[in-house]
Amino acid sequence: MAWEVFAIYHKDQPLWRGLLNQIELDRNNMDLWIRRPCVNDPKTDDYVREHLTRFVRLHRDFRPLFYNIADELGQGDQIRPNDFCHSTHCTSKFAEYLRKMYGTPANVGREWFVTEETRWDDESLKNGSHWATSNLMVNRTTTDQAFDTVAVAAFEAKCGGIAGLNKAWGTNFPAPHSGAGGREQWEPLRALLSETRSLPELTEKTLSERLGPIEKANARWGTHTTWAAEQRPTEFKSWSEVVAFLNRFYHELSQVRSTEGWNVSPWCDFRNFMDETFADAIGRARAVCKAEDPHARCATEGGQAPFAFGWYNYENVVKHVDVIEPYNIGNNVEVIRSLNPDVIMISTHGFQHKPGAPLTEEDRLYQKRAPQPIWWGLFHGHRGSIIWDDNLPEYRFVDEETRQLTPAASTFADTFLELHKGIAKLIINSRRLHDGIAIQYSQPSMQVHWLLDNLQHAREWMLHSGGDRGSHFTGVRNGWTKLIEDLGLQYEFVGARQIEQGKLTRNEFRALILPQSLAVSSREVEQIRQFVHTGGILIADYRAATMNEHGRDLGRGQLDDLFGITHSKGQPSGSGVSGMENYLSLHLQGRKLDLMIGDEGLRATTGKALAQSGQIPLIVVNDFGQGKAVFLNVELASYPYQRLTRNSPTSLPEIMEQVFGLAGIQPQARVLDEAGKRLAGAEAVRFANGAYEHVAIFCNPQFDDGGWGDLPTQAERGWAGPIDNSRLEKQAQITVAWPAGMATYDIRGRRDLGIIDKIQMTLDPWSPVVLTRAPKPIPVLRVEAPIEAQPGNPLLVTLRNESPLPEGAFRIVRLEFVKPDSKPYELYARNVRVESTPHLERLHLAYNDPQGRWQINAHDLITGRVARTEFTLR
């Protein structure tokens, strides 16, 4: 409805590309980073209010399923990096944001490492003087300045200061007097970087033409000193020396892998503000719709991966939408269903086929694959599907000339028909279960990781970065989710704010995972400590809580004492990884392990090093209160690829199975292959229905390439992703095993399997096995109807249990009607939720319904049983 406000830079690509071309040549002009339209401009609110009010009034009488505010939206072009928005409206709002967070300008200065912050930006704008408006806080928040800050931290750690750089590189930047220092000493270097970054190519010619004589440039750069250093020229002898210096500088910056000494809090604070203020604008649009239509559900479509840009901090997003259509990217589906299960998720599906062309074997393979994401979505929180037809010849479901269904329609027909007949309603109305595993969702960590990922693009970050495929943090998060799922377990993401508010201490979780969570607040740390002290298991990989939530390095890990570790300079590694000790459920002594080292500078202190490579510990366990902390000095980002590779030697699954054993976490339904081993790539999801439990078992492919980086892919076709999932595309003979025998029913196969603790079945690579488990056999359902009924009158159908269902349990019953000519009558078919009986279902018969004997079939989804009755229409 309002793409021209919320998705303008994606839908209008010439506008976006033109903006980037301008910015590339004028990097320090913040007027170019004024978003048009600005979401905080009152005129934008007026437009949205008028436009959406008119739109909703036009459609509300038709009771639409939802109102789509915008598709594929974002501050810039979806998640592509940007420095929006530097309008006066956003600058004033940013001042309000900082005032609420920090209280005083001096507190901002202390956090940002900036001296003499004395007034807020909204006050400076009101002042209007050149001095006031040229020294705005918001001017310190740009991505270029963040990369400069990272560079200064890296070179300070390496050289000690500007004097050390001069000595090591043979340069002659003005250096502070002996005993003086600080970050300000690097200002001459930052001045050089600032002047040269607007040149697309670093050549003697372009530098000379743009910046003038080298002598004048030296003089300009040399004036950027503090009281501690003498102002003097920088003494580059020629532009060729500057080119060589910059090439070396950016090469060494691209090699940085540590966040030691970083303080990117101005940038992180502004990114958080923009995510929040954009989400607030969506919230205002939603409020306009609901004011006109109290029944309105408001949506955004084309949801991207959780990311440092766009507005895709899902802790904000899920507060401002009722419905979302997320592209299944970067685990966003898992994040959404975890952070707010009340948000309705839907997915979009289609099949590409040239009209009139015969189906090839490849086409038929893609037809088999196409419905798989629909089943997957059902078990991961989706509640509906959009069919991508758009009347495009290669996607349309109905041939306009022949009025026949196309191969695109037949691809999905059987799946949609089965879902329509009740199984979807059963799963949607049941409660998804997890195994007590929480994964932290950390937007600040995501932001810092984006900087780490893109140091190689520091000069051209807006042009050569921005995709989720290159996001290492996305790869780590995906590695954790796939690893847990492969073990037959489930999890929930827990947001940083939820942790601060005490969610970990409500006895819902037994283990917490920090997936390279670099940036963690002190309030989170306090809650995490309490969680472990009272018996929880904390698990982290090799980057954990070394920064605060603003992106400022603290010089130590806030949880290092809890893990029993410390950090030092690199230590020698061995030729492999060996298990050194056993510890409770961890049986590692004498084992050769296939693991990738994370941090070569890690050392164990009070923690026990259970596995090492040379002097480097890889698995460290430490007792803390009643709980334990496990530090995995291991890289997980490549696990999603390893799991799809035949005969992969990775030890991660067996290690994590034993780590979860410390918390008593074991799969409640084990899926085994013919050899009795865990079936590779299978996922099991359980749903609670009162005392009953529904279990879905299915092959778990990799649908997207988020975090895939340089790992191998294959050619992409249409809706199919570029990942090779062929290892999981074979029919498997499986055994499903449970800890105890219970009454078990095959929902899709409509079979009563009896009281069992294991069952052998065939698992199709494209569709699931779905079972019901019950403490005792489920009561039989009866269906009753009057002996006779009359056309035009109501018909009352009674559903009755032979004995009551357990408290909180329900059935989904598919009522279907068969006419006297033995043909089904879809008009009266429906899915009925039955909680207690007798349940009366009323339907109105038409005057022109055929007279004779009708049959009613009541299919009980949870058991597969079908009850029947008849009535005569006369």
Outline where the language-model segments fall.
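Short, aromatic- and glycine-rich surface loops/edge beta-strands on solvent-exposed regions
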Residues: 768-773, 851-862
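Beta-strand-rich structural segments
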Residues: 793-803, 813-817
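Short acidic/polar inter-strand loop motif in beta-rich domains
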Residues: 776-778, 860-868
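Hydrophobic targeting/anchoring helices
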Residues: 26-33, 58, 68, 77, ...
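A conserved amphipathic helix/loop scaffold
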Residues: 366-370, 386, 504, 515-784
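Polysaccharide-binding and catalytic clefts of secreted carbohydrate-active enzymes
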Residues: 33-46, 50-318, 323, 335, ...
